[in-house]
Amino acid sequence: QPGLAGVPALVERARRAGLPVTLRMEGTSAAVAEGVALTAHRIVGEALRNVLAHAGPATALVRITVGGGVLTVEVVDTGRGPRRPPDRIGHGLVGMRERVALYGGILRTGPAPGGGFRVYARIPLDPAGAVPA
């Protein structure tokens, strides 16, 4: 099921594919609009697919937090980090950025401290100023 309730299934699918993943979900999802929850689901799915495809031997941490009027999504891996030149961003990352922007949020991607790759999204729960999906 797409949305926050479907995130554990995405994590389990990545685990079955051989990626050790830790999932941490904090806060209540009751305040999260359906479109925002779907965006979070898609970010996690795309980020885990990228880890499986590009990181080599790695582990991953998926952290979703709802609180303080925002939803944050963070996926960090311990893999080899980005191999593309910085000016070549994959279509998946572009799609993530566009969906987050629809809700007035920000997406940051890049090397993780200590190696690997990090995807971080911060999306306001208040839809004021957001563009309808």
Residue ranges and their predicted role:
Residues 1-133:
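Glycine-rich ATP/GTP-binding catalytic cores of kinases/NTPases
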